[in-house]
Amino acid sequence: MSKPKYNRVVLKLSGEALAGEQGFGINPTVIKSVAEQVKEIAELDVEVAVVVGGGNIWRGKIGSEMGMDRAGADYMGMLATVMNSLALQDSLENIGIQTRVQTSIEMRQVAEPYIRRKAVRHLEKKRVVIFAAGTGNPYFSTDTTAALRAAEIEADVILMAKNNVDGVYNADPSIDPTATKYETLTYLDVLKEGLGVMDSTASSLCMDNDIPLIVFSVMEKGNIKRAVLGENIGTVVRGK
């Protein structure tokens, strides 16, 4: 059996990835597939933390464009991530993977509050930890949550699993057939070129803390395991 390249990872899933082709809500087939892929790497003794977006249910930015208070709209988005996290927890536990959900906003009847030392202890015990409710602050994306939590738990890498693209391109491949995929990039490249990998706050946090990022498609089964084993898939972003 191949040895994993990374021992502790943060898997970033967009909410849209959980919606699948239906585009909204949670697709049972997709979430089951994601859970099975997480199980594959957990069985390699990789310590797995997960950050899930909420865009399949609600986006704070859309709410603010409708005239809502931005902070209130963002809090709704955080609650959407909790719904996704509980659904993923259920899928993982149904296939025998011990899982804990930790939320940045306290809701003790639903999940544990986020405590860094406790999260690390869960990981050391080979439990999958799902970080929900973003950073607990409005105006911060779940990409930034992934970068922040990765820094806090000293993760080796962030695995950014996409549902509609298999890496980072110099143009939108769904519009421009000549778009070229990058194999490697630096965070400065991402910031200078305005590449839509993650928002600038998240990119800067990763760059400052020297956290590599792998962008790949989650729709191809086995890709999460391939990324953990260090196979050449997607786009790798690192350094300055």
From Swiss-Prot:
Region of interest (Involved in allosteric activation by GTP), ranges: 20-25
Superkingdom per UniProt: Bacteria
Keywords recorded for this protein, A-Z: Allosteric enzyme, ATP-binding, Cytoplasm, Kinase, Nucleotide-binding, Pyrimidine biosynthesis, Transferase
Reactions catalysed: UMP + ATP = UDP + ADP
Gene that produces this protein: pyrH
Pfam families: AA_kinase
Species for this entry: Bacillus cereus (strain ATCC 14579 / DSM 31 / CCUG 7414 / JCM 2152 / NBRC 15305 / NCIMB 9373 / NCTC 2599 / NRRL B-3711)
First-level EC class: transferase
Protein location: Cytoplasm
EC numbers on record: 2.7.4.22
Entry protein name: Uridylate kinase
CDD domains: AAK_UMPK-PyrH-Ec
GO biological process, any: 'de novo' CTP biosynthetic process
Summary of subunit composition and partner proteins: Homohexamer.
Biological or metabolic pathway of the protein: Pyrimidine metabolism; CTP biosynthesis via de novo pathway; UDP from UMP (UMPK route): step 1/1
GO molecular function: ATP binding; UMP kinase activity
List of residues binding ATP: 12-15, 55, 59, 163, 169, 172
InterPro entries linked to this entry: AceGlu_kinase-like_sf, Asp/Glu/Uridylate_kinase, Uridylate_kinase, Uridylate_kinase_bac
The keyword Cytoplasm is annotated on this UniProt entry: yes
Family of the protein in this entry: Belongs to the UMP kinase family.
Binding residues annotated for UMP, in chain numbering: 54, 74, 135-142
One GO cellular component, as annotated: cytoplasm
Reported function: Catalyzes the reversible phosphorylation of UMP to UDP.
Regulation acting on activity, per entry: Allosterically activated by GTP. Inhibited by UTP.
